[in-house]
């Protein structure tokens, strides 16, 4: 490059740096002073440009080119200092590598210090966000069996149980359950250590190893597993150990002395044995590992003498299985004499009861849909950009060393394909070994193989590699920043204990508690580890041959016939219709032998008559303060004044200071012949409600309203304080626009909803010093004050998405937002099957298991009554991504399979109805768009109108 060209390119780097510095300094001025005058921003930027050109002319372009990346923020359309920081970090990390700057310590010491600091940070991160207490479902079971040396569900997980039990013996942490949670943080950190070592051993580079390790550490499900009691963290650890031993075998096999390579084969066999002992799914890695070994060393087939040590090591890895028969007669949870028999042992250790779930989705259409979902599973963990980087890294790795690409990429692909066929309720967790393999592809693909030629020009490849490595670190830091609030929130979540205590503390003496698996395990923990209410008998209600709801109803009837008070965690309105009236017990349901005649002690007394029909004698509000994203739980205690007419309905309202309706629920009621009737309401504040004090009002109606004493249709019961949300509302259009009206408000995003074609709705999401809230505008665009734009210069250019564009944004309870469904072919015929995919966003971690119910409807000629319908209810993502796994910012697409009825006509209007409901209680998730709730009661899905044929 000529001297003039060199100066010109260096000046370009200086210009980029100057523009960036000028913009950031101007915006920092605006941050402290409200805004920056255009002339001041111009002067600051001009000085920075001159200084940048002068400074960068001292460096050749091959050293200064990373500064051009600062143009990312120079042209970024919003004032956002976080994005500026990300751009600056990207440049510094790239520049650090381009100029081969060393840490101010000896190289050998740096190779120790960097991973130690990284791993210490990750462990402290997990400790800071660790689940604090008992957990539900499998997590709760693992806490219980670890504390009492019990036997977990098949395959039993004996090695995990023993190691977690040792953890419970350590003298720190408040309770055993906490220490079992901490064990996951330990195993997850060890997995990160193994991943780092594997990448570093193969690439010899610190930064790619650290970048890839941090990506895995902050992946959604990996972080979740690192902070809760589970067996998946150990599954990931054994997968990582297998990959490490095979990588070391790869490095040693070509050396003159084969003994070290043989030792790594023995270590692989041991970890493989321990791995499949822990979880049989790791055997699938063997389908790739064994061909890899043969590819690397074909002579092993001709050397049987080399087999026996690996075989013995593998058999040694199976020794933990002896725990099962040795505990067959122990008086602990899960133990059974059948474990001491060969058939019983094999059935448990091999988990043969789950064999019907494997290879379920092999039918081509279902399998292709599952592959779509597997892509969503990956984007649930990593950003779309990172998933593309994974594919690019696999290409780089295959170019340099196809055998390693076969090992890591093949393992990830095989595990993904097999998981896609598996009817697993939590596919995001089953995929952990695949995430480990993919991260190894990422780190080694970017870091390169020590001593191997690189594709293309070394200079071009090196520059690209440096840039992509820096980009991975920036993505990892962004993942950390975006997900920390969710896991910090879960660190304060005591839902399982609160639920279990609400039942056990109020349960009648010697009651029978019928529980689903989700709630049975934490209740068992309280009883068996903390000795809470051992008089209450807890029975897990497992599925039988009949419909599950009918099993519950039968079990309740049997308990009542046995003269016992019965509590259930599940409720089904149709199946329970013939049972006596229940009363709420926390979130559970109590069927009493004798009706309640006295008001419970935690209720406030009241005497409110609603017409000549109902007298409210007391109430309970669960919490005096909630957030905008929480539900207000109100329980009314009442008695009939006279016999109630059919269809009598109680309602509860949340009412703002100005009298506007902030939340509502109507419940058709039944009454007892004797005693008090209890009705529980869950009031979700509607979007647009602002923080403040709200009244809780109640009323009732039949054919006419039941008027209160003052003649009004509703009467005040209590008040509740509603505070701003701690989480930014989920949005398709994030912004950071600081208003200049002195309010301190910042627009955090906006969304447009055109679900109703003739009634557009605009949501504005605001951030203030107290938290987040939203405003709602129907068929209008508000006039807003000026805001601080790029360079901190005041701007009034408010531009929102066209309100005529197809856009959907329908908030539901618990922070879930429906953002639309896939388009339907215009030409649909009778009998045709349809796949309708719904998209969702999450504002905050979801703490309930929601079922998505999609109903396809053929309307009669009046466009109102139904001629036919088809229903598909499923857990999101065909069970792959349950709502219990969602955190703030999660994006999930869920397919539903419905069919056009054979009786449908070409001119018939066809539509759809989408609702979400609790998998256990059947409670419908509140629809927080008052227009849709009043007109439909569900989210209407447009499929075909008579005009479209």
Model-derived features: positions:
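Short acidic/glycine- and proline-prone juxtamembrane loop motifs at membrane-interface regions
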Residues: 224-232
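Signature aromatic-anchored transmembrane alpha helix within multi-pass, membrane-resident enzymes
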Residues: 13-20, 398-401, 444-482
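Membrane-interface transmembrane helices that cradle and orient dolichyl/undecaprenyl
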Residues: 52-63, 200-203, 242-268, 272-275, ...
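Transmembrane-helix signature of polytopic, membrane-embedded enzymes
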Residues: 56-68, 195-218, 237, 257-260, ...
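Transmembrane-helix motifs of polytopic, lipid-linked glycan transferases
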Residues: 48-56, 182-203, 241-245, 392, ...
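Hydrophobic, aromatic-rich transmembrane alpha-helices
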Residues: 49-54, 379-402
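C-terminal luminal/periplasmic domains and tails of membrane-associated envelope-modifying transferases
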Residues: 501-515, 521-524, 530-949
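Perimembrane helix-loop-helix junctions
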Residues: 91-102, 250-251, 256, 284-315
